[in-house]
């Protein structure tokens, strides 16, 4: 599941072009659970100032693309003014996480260690590539380590202990 958190708000996507003439807007969503948003979402926070807007309608147009109607946006011109703006929701409005899911912000800042207990460094970022996610680990006096986020390498993510356990293969951390 992909979510980016800022001050108890989760980034869920960006607004695109208007959809129709009555103020509906395309929402390019990164949510893994759009059906939860469609059923439960009532408020979104838009733009760098996180301006709250009440949602009057939200539905799936096609995978990854939702159509959103905001109560205060009633025409195509007003909808066009929001094109490109980032959309956030309150963390409490997100779908509950499954046992094997986590928020990216829970991982960033974790201590990375090998499965034998050797300290690697601190998780600085998670990059998304077309093939999957890459964990960026900052190491003292060495270049960052880039570790694919796959079960072969990431053997445990302990949110409570703030530890990411890696099973390195030869050359992975060199």
UniProtKB/Swiss-Prot annotation:
GO terms for cellular component: cytosol; ribosome. Signal peptide: none annotated. Residues 99-172 form the PRC barrel domain. Its main location: cytoplasm. GO terms for molecular function: ribosome binding. GO terms for biological process: maturation of SSU-rRNA. It is found in: Cytoplasm. Pfam families: PRC (PF05239), RimM (PF01782). Keywords: Chaperone, Cytoplasm, Ribosome biogenesis, rRNA processing. The keyword rRNA processing applies. Belongs to the RimM family. An accessory protein needed during the final step in the assembly of 30S ribosomal subunit, possibly for assembly of the head region. Essential for efficient processing of 16S rRNA. May be needed both before and after RbfA during the maturation of 16S rRNA. It has affinity for free ribosomal 30S subunits but not for 70S ribosomes. The PRC barrel domain binds ribosomal protein uS19. Binds ribosomal protein uS19. PANTHER family: RIBOSOME MATURATION FACTOR RIMM (PTHR33692:SF1). This is Ribosome maturation factor RimM. It comes from Chloroflexus aurantiacus (strain ATCC 29366 / DSM 635 / J-10-fl).
């Amino acid at each position: 599941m992909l979510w980016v958190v800022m001050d108890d708000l989760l980034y869920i996507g960006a607004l695109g072009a208007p959809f129709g003439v009555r103020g509906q807007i395309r929402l390019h969503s990164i949510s893994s659970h759009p059906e939860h948003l469609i059923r439960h979402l009532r408020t979104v926070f838009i733009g760098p100032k996180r301006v709250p807007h009440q949602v009057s309608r939200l539905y799936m147009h096609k995978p990854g693309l939702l159509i959103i109607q905001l109560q205060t946006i009633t025409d195509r011109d007003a909808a066009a003014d929001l094109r490109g703006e980032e959309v956030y929701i309150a963390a409490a409005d997100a779908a509950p996480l499954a046992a094997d899911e986590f928020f990216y912000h829970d991982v960033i800042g974790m201590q990375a260690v090998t499965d034998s207990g050797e300290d690697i460094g601190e998780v600085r970022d998670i990059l998304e590539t077309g093939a999957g996610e890459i964990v960026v680990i900052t190491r003292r006096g060495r270049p960052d380590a880039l570790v694919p986020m796959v079960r072969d390498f990431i053997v445990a993510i302990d949110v409570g202990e703030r530890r990411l356990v890696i099973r390195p293969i030869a050359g992975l951390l060199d």
